[in-house]
Amino acid sequence: MERSGPSEVTGSDASGPDPQLAVTMGFTGFGKKARTFDLEAMFEQTRRTAVERSRKTLEAREKEEEMNREKELRRQNEDIEPTSSRSNVVRDCSKSSSRDTSSSESEQSSDSSDDELIGPPLPPKMVGKPVNFMEEDILGPLPPPLNEEEEEAEEEEEEEEEEENPVHKIPDSHEITLKHGTKTVSALGLDPSGARLVTGGYDYDVKFWDFAGMDASFKAFRSLQPCECHQIKSLQYSNTGDMILVVSGSSQAKVIDRDGFEVMECIKGDQYIVDMANTKGHTAMLHTGSWHPKIKGEFMTCSNDATVRTWEVENPKKQKSVFKPRTMQGKKVIPTTCTYSRDGNLIAAACQNGSIQIWDRNLTVHPKFHYKQAHDSGTDTSCVTFSYDGNVLASRGGDDSLKLWDIRQFNKPLFSASGLPTMFPMTDCCFSPDDKLIVTGTSIQRGCGSGKLVFFERRTFQRVYEIDITDASVVRCLWHPKLNQIMVGTGNGLAKVYYDPNKSQRGAKLCVVKTQRKAKQAETLTQDYIITPHALPMFREPRQRSTRKQLEKDRLDPLKSHKPEPPVAGPGRGGRVGTHGGTLSSYIVKNIALDKTDDSNPREAILRHAKAAEDSPYWVSPAYSKTQPKTMFAQVESDDEEAKNEPEWKKRKI
């Protein structure tokens, strides 16, 4: 296309200015002439220029990609054939250098062309960064980039896989250890809000732990013995969290408040009444207890007197109702554990004959469900618990087994797991908050390994996870639904709390971040003394002595102590005469141990009065002068005559 010059005009302007008009106006000409432009021609020229520059840019990019491919192939060939000739290498280097120069020129031209590019830019999806094969040793074409929607879909799939795997929900990344004592922690209780933990053990102590008020020292803020010298078997907070049910080895359960003060104590029944329904309370040792999940102030206990009794806090003088477990023959059987269902309408108890019996709460006569061989007879079933949906019951038997039951078909267990040793009559089992896992602990002999916390999947009942707790038995376990933390009581006096900072809420996370408080040292102010060893004695100030030493010194001074003079022992001294008989021994010698022998002749003493008796007889002679004036004496008899006169039965037998 030809461009019109500045001198080109169209129409009537080709003939130039009118000379007649110029003469009339009085000037020689009209000056410079205005330029005219062809817009269509200019637009066409611009379009062609843009197309040419875009073509050059695309050619430069294609050349650059081709060079990169050749470099990659050459690198692969060098790796395969390292012993290539030097001439080929030089040739390749020369070619590469020439290509590099050409590529640099093309890059410069492309940069300049990009700067001079006219028209709207290409969309970002069509303009991609050149692939750098030098950075990554990738063979073949690269996969296409993912869209944002595809990435979000993949992330959602990964999250769903994690949610489907219940093991990922176990909070066991961190743990803290609470030192209860040296004996077995046989009871654990956590309030519904998860603020306070209470532990009880074989050492009769009940300790309170406050997560919000506790620091990194992990010390209990209160310790007490509510049942004196009875082992604590069960501790449980009420559904409102204001009361704690304490079940010990005695026959009377207690209810205490959050601070440990007694609220009520159940009455003890009459031991001499045969029918246990007629007694007002338990008459034998308790095993466990449980609060009603819906009704405030109602709880349940089971005992060795073969009864399960329900109580009300407002009426401690008599139980509310009595359930009496029986065998198939109608005989008494001792319940070892009991619990309420989640809605509170059912009461389940496991007995020593291996049976599990479930009653309707309002019907105390006959059980609604009865399975007589749930566990081995003669073993103590330590725990029965309902799932959160209320359809499944888990039982932890003394026969080293864990079984799962469906109460809608209570004729056989759904699943059973064996090889779980237990040596304590209160070994726990519980459900996870999402009802997908079942947890229980195992017992061991001392020095024979470590106690474990075992996790089973509810759907398949496979052992999916284990946690090594400590070198002692695992007795109690508790999985709090709000905190998502696991509490464990062990046989060596420890209570452990397992949590995950990302999955758990509050609880142990509150006290871990607090530093341990430093112990305050008592400071005393004493009088300051300036000691100058070279000062004169008269100006020296005597040092302060202890009170005890000063009293001893004053005691030795008779003037200060006003000590009376002691008696003189032995010979006199200091102007004082020793007293004779001052001691007990000298007094005895003086008064008792004297020689009082009489050397006088008794005959002479009597004959001294003989003449006076003859002259004036009064005592003997006048008495017989009238009655017997002549003196008569008894005749002497021989022993033989006396022997003859004796009776036969008195005679001596020779």
Curated annotation (Swiss-Prot):
Pfam family of the protein (one): WD40
Ranges of the WD repeats in the UniProt entry: 180-219, 227-268, 281-321, 330-369, 376-415, 421-466, 469-508
Signal peptide (UniProt feature, chain positions): none
SMART domains found in the cross-reference section: WD40
MF GO annotations: enzyme binding
A cellular-component GO term for this protein: site of double-strand break
Cross-link (Glycyl lysine isopeptide (Lys-Gly) (interchain with G-Cter in SUMO2)): K296, K590, K596
SUPFAM superfamilies given in the database record: WD40 repeat-like
Biased composition (Basic and acidic residues): 45-78, 165-175, 540-565, 644-654
Bias (Low complexity): 99-111
Coiled-coil residue windows: none
Spans through the membrane: none
Gene3D superfamilies registered for this protein in UniProt: YVTN repeat-like/Quinoprotein amine dehydrogenase (2.130.10.10)
Keyword presence, Acetylation: yes
Residues the record lists as Phosphoserine modifications: S621, S638
Keywords: Acetylation, Isopeptide bond, Phosphoprotein, Repeat, Ubl conjugation, WD repeat
Modified residues (N6-acetyllysine): K452
Keyword match Ubl conjugation: yes
Acidic residues composition bias: residue spans: 147-164
Residue ranges of the region described as Disordered: 1-26, 43-175, 540-579, 630-654
Residues that bear Phosphothreonine: T579
Entry's family note: Belongs to the WD repeat GAD-1 family.
Protein name stated in the entry: WD repeat-containing protein 70
Species per Swiss-Prot/TrEMBL record: Homo sapiens
